[in-house]
UniProtKB/Swiss-Prot annotation:
This is Ectonucleotide pyrophosphatase/phosphodiesterase family member 1. Zn(2+) 2 binds at D358, H362, H517. Keywords: Biomineralization, Calcium, Cell membrane, Disease variant, Disulfide bond, Glycoprotein, Hydrolase, Membrane, Metal-binding, Phosphoprotein, Repeat, Secreted, Signal-anchor, Transmembrane, Transmembrane helix, Zinc. Changing R680S: In allele ENPP1b. It comes from Mus musculus. DTMP binds at T238, N259, Y322, D358, H406, H517. N-glycosylated. The secreted form is produced through cleavage at Lys-85 by intracellular processing. The record marks K896 as: Essential for catalytic activity. The modification Phosphoserine is found at S25. Binds 2 Zn(2+) ions per subunit. The gene is Enpp1. Changing S30 to A/D: Little change in baolateral sorting in epithelial cells. SMART domains: Endonuclease_NS (SM00892), NUC (SM00477), SO (SM00201). InterPro entries: Alkaline_phosphatase_core_sf, DNA/RNA_non-sp_Endonuclease_sf, Endo_G_ENPP1-like_dom, ENPP1-3/EXOG-like_nuc-like, His-Me_finger_sf, Phosphodiest/P_Trfase, SMB_chordata, Somatomedin_B-like_dom_sf.
Length: 906
């Protein structure tokens, strides 16, 4: 290693004295000796001037000679080339002790005589990783982080942009955008490597708004595959989302549910600044570098949450313990160096992480000049990476995923909720502050599970008009959030409106007037960045939004790995790839499906319905269907195929009616689903069907099928899956929806929601979309894991009312499907559009603070809050939709995993 100031490989090196001065040359000493001889004669000559000594001219000649000699020596040993030309630049002179009209050594700063270009020539290259025209041809110094010297290629220490700046070659961003049809890799690369590159806190909107200032990222977007919004996981925090990206798991599944959390079973707390962060017990699931290790694929991680922790006893082959002070350029250069390792050492998968623009967003807010500067900085750094890949011949070989973990929101001190305002004494509780706040008792773990969270949630509900927070017992949170099934998630959580945060009191708040994140993952300002670029990705493609849990399966496909079990839908991102690797298939039906003919005899149901509404003889005739009738019914009621039953050992009757189709569970004695089509011009009748039921003789009769069972219950009643008022076939066809096979136990408070949905919203949706197909049914999720419960769990959670065992649903689902082309009806769709909802079934409507409100002011808002993916409905019901469609399964997975973004954040 050469010392700073020495020039490597160029001429002799001069020694220096201990005080930093150069040692005196012997030749100079001998030449200076005559100066001593000339001093005394000169003085004598001046005193003897009046006498005009004849030796005067000799003395003057000698003095003149000495002066000339002194000047020459000064030029040689002091001023050097400045004698011939005045030197005003430090180029080639950095940190040398040479004297001129300006200096370039470290002392010049204190002396105040530095050359004007000292800073940019000698100082900036010690921490700047790029060349400029002025640096080209500079003298190499070891203290420079990279070189722009003419021979830097030989020494392999060139700055990344040396070729474009000093050799007038095009940089990567200046080259034309070409489709990479086949990988163009160096011979030593058997297959394209993959790099996962995270720009923390890069809000999706940044690229929409400031793309013109970001030439490199914009080129990647235009030349690769891009989505306007990648949906993060909830809460939209750094550690949970980075770990979701590399595991394909929800935070509730992989255990990292927040940047700060408490585990009552471990009785330990996790934070980003604690040593507990390195405890492997916090990390569940299998990150991709562990997956790679199991399949003998090497990985290198330059920072990624979890990558410096022994998960399953495994670390990446190359990794760095997180240190935020490491310059961004150093991280990029390290990855480029790893790509040059011998093939037996070289990783095949890489991660790279930068803290910006998150850091600037937190400090100054998302709409600030500082964030714009941070965006331009990371754009230059991405350009540095691409230029480095180009120099290595990897710019058309490596598959790059440029990604972020979440967005950023502007905070306001006026948009903070403080619980002490409502609770008074708060000494017995602790709140994890923010937009996804959680509460637990201070006395943990002793009272963690026994604390009366329900009473506290009720106390904090509907305290004031237009309340900006909602307290939730976690089983009632929107199922799309998947934020319940973990002991690390406190039983009481808070859902905040856009831009709002919550803390126990003002002293515990943070990010009051600056940027923050963590809110609902459907809020537009929480959306993240995704760009895929490389030979595997499509050229110039823009795709619909998707969730970041899908990226793990995508990366496994790129690397040729078999994914570990995860929450993603493998194959749902096939449309991003030129040549998809994995070909998904529909799940196999597991339930026992049968036809159920009329067997039973009629009984008194204890109803008080007008006889003219349900003439029994005519009603029975309607159920005698021909084969042709059944075909027509299937075409009308399940145009995309009936839902398949994935519930193992489950016995289901398929019941056909003129207007709807039912999958009736003989195990639960209630319908699992009902399907019908609501055309644009269909109308609802005004008949009053309350207290009207007709016994379905095709199924066993249960006490829960009788009107009399519900008469004395003030809260529990029954509801119809298919609305009786929908009568679209003929005026002579009586409402088959009054059949006992169409009812489910339903709280009276929920009937308000259900009736408004049927009587008002479905009519409007059918008119707007030129008709809709509707599938609805009960949900049982007593263990709140977002998956259908086993028969054993259902039995444990059944209730006894009036000496009769009854199973009350925890939720109800609705799946609405229509055509993308509004000119088509639901019976002839060329392409589908869907929306799904999973509504909590609660004995009150306190969630919506409905007192004094009309249904029109809150029901649709509730539906929007509890919107879900079709995939979420499938997981929680054990059903599978759209299996008779002609589209590929991967195309259907795109449809099933879609969710719209909440764009209005007033």
């Amino acid at each position: 290693m050469e010392r700073d100031g020495d020039q490597a490989g160029h001429g002799p090196r001069h020694g220096s004295a201990g005080n930093g001065r150069e040692l005196e040359s012997p030749a100079a000493a001998s030449l200076l000796a005559p100066m001593d001889l000339g001093e005394e004669p000169l003085e004598k000559a001046e005193r003897a001037r009046p006498a005009k000594d004849p030796n005067t001219y000799k003395v003057l000649s000698l003095v003149l000679s000495v002066c000339v000699l002194t000047t020459i020596l000064g030029c040689i040993f002091g001023l050097k080339p400045s004698c011939a030309k005045e030197v005003k630049s430090c180029k080639g002179r950095c940190f040398e002790r040479t004297f001129s009209n300006c200096r370039c050594d470290a002392a010049c700063v204190s002396l105040g005589n530095c050359c004007l270009d000292f800073q940019e020539t000698c100082v900036e290259p010690t921490h700047i990783w790029t060349c400029n025209k002025f640096r080209c041809g500079e003298k190499r110094l070891s203290r420079f982080v990279c070189s722009c010297a003419d021979d830097c290629k030989t020494h392999n220490d060139c700055c990344i942009n040396y070729s474009s700046v000093c050799q007038d070659k095009k940089s990567w961003v200046e080259e034309t955008c070409e489709s990479i049809d086949t990988p163009e890799c160096p011979a030593e690369f058997e297959s394209p490597p993959t790099l996962l590159f995270s720009l923390d806190g890069f809000r999706a909107e940044y690229l929409h708004t400031w793309g013109g200032l970001l030439p490199v990222i914009s080129k990647l977007k235009n030349c690769g595959t891009y989505t306007k919004n990648m949906r993060p996981m909830y809460p939209t925090k750094t550690f949970p989302n980075h770990y979701s990206i590399v595991t394909g798991l929800y935070p509730e599944s992989h255990g990292i549910i927040d940047n700060k959390m408490y585990d009552p079973k471990m009785n330990a707390s996790f934070s980003l600044k604690s040593k507990e962060k390195f405890n492997p017990l916090w990390y569940k699931g299998q990150p991709i570098w562990v997956t790679a290790n199991h399949q003998e694929v090497k990985s290198g991680t330059y920072f990624w949450p979890g990558s410096d922790v022994e998960i399953d006893g495994i670390l990446p082959d190359i990794y760095k313990v997180y240190n935020g002070s490491v310059p961004f350029e150093e991280r990029i250069l390290a990855v480029l160096e790893w790509l040059q390792l011998p093939s037996h050492e070289r990783p095949h998968f890489y991660t790279l992480y930068l803290e910006e623009p998150d850091s600037s967003g937190h400090s100054h807010g998302p709409v600030s000049s500082e964030v714009i500067k941070a965006l331009q900085k990371v754009d230059r750094l991405v350009g540095m990476l691409m230029d480095g890949l180009k120099d290595l011949g990897l710019d058309k070989c490596l598959n790059l995923i440029l990604i972020s973990d979440h967005g950023m929101e502007q905070g306001s001190c006026k948009k903070y909720v403080y619980l002490n305002k409502y609770l008074g004494d708060v000494n017995n509780v602790k709140v994890v502050y923010g937009p996804a706040a959680r509460l637990r008792p201070t006395d943990v773990p002793e009272t963690y599970y026994s604390f009366n969270y329900e009473a506290l949630a009720k106390n904090l509900s509907c305290r004031e008009p237009n309340q900006h927070f909602r307290p939730y017992l976690k089983p009632f949170l929107p199922k799309r959030l998947h934020f319940a099934k973990s002991d690390r998630i406190e039983p009481l959580t808070f859902y905040l409106d856009p831009q709002w945060q919550l803390a126990l009191n003002p002293s515990e708040r943070k990010y009051c007037g600056s940027g923050f994140h963590g809110s609902d993952n459907l809020f537009s300002n929480m959306q993240a960045l995704f760009i895929g670029y490389g030979p595997a990705f499509k050229h110039g493609a823009e795709v619909d939004s998707f969730e970041n849990i899908e990226v793990y399966n995508l990366m496994c496909d790129l690397l040729g790995l078999i994914p570990a079990p995860n929450n993603g839908s493998h194959g749902s991102l096939n449309h991003l790839l030129k040549k998809p690797i994995y070909n998904p298939s529909h799940p196999k039906e597991e339930g026992f499906l049968s036809q159920c003919p009329i067997k039973s005899t009629s009984n008194d149901l204890g109803c008080t319905c007008d006889p003219w509404i349900v003439p029994i003889k005519d009603f029975e005739k309607q159920l005698n269907l021909t084969t042709e009738d059944v075909d027509d019914i299937y075409h009308m009621t399940v145009p995309y195929g009936r839902p398949r039953i994935l519930l193992k050992q489950h016995h289901v009757c398929l019941l056909q009616q003129q207007q709807f189709l039912t999958g009736y569970s003989l195990d639960l004695l209630m319908p699992l689903w009902a399907s019908y089509t609501f055309l644009r011009n269909d109308q609802f009748s005004r008949d009053d069907f309350s207290n009207c039921l007709y016994q379905d003789l095709r199924i066993p009769l249960s006490p829960v099928h009788k009107c009399s069972y519900y008469k004395s219950n003030s809260k529990l009643s029954y509801g119809f899956l298919t609305p009786p008022r929908l009568n679209r076939v003929s005026n002579h066809i009586y409402s088959e929806a009054l059949l006992t096979s169409n009812i489910v136990p339903m709280y009276q408070s929920f009937q308000v929601i259900w009736h408004y949905l049927h009587d008002t919203l479905l009519q409007r949706y059918a008119h707007e979309r030129n008709g809709i197909n509707v599938v609805s049914g009960p949900v049982f999720d007593f263990d709140y894991d977002g998956r259908y419960d086993s028969l054993e769990i259902l039995k444990q959670n059944s209730r006894v009312i009036r000496s009769q065992e009854i199973l009350i649903p925890t939720h109800f689902f609705i799946v609405l499907t229509s055509c993308k082309q509004l000119s088509e009806t639901p019976l002839e769709c060329s392409a589908l559009e869907s929306s799904a909802y999973i509504l909590p079934h609660r004995p009150d409507n306190i969630e919506s603070c409905t007192h004094g409100k009309r249904e029109s002011s809150w029901v649709e808002e509730l539906l929007t809050l509890h919107r879900a993916r079709v995939t979420d409905v499938e997981l929680i019901t054990g059903l599978s939709f759209y299996q008779d469609r002609q589209e590929s399964v991967s195309e259907l997975l795109r449809l099933k995993t879609h969710l719209p973004i909440f764009s209005q954040e007033d």
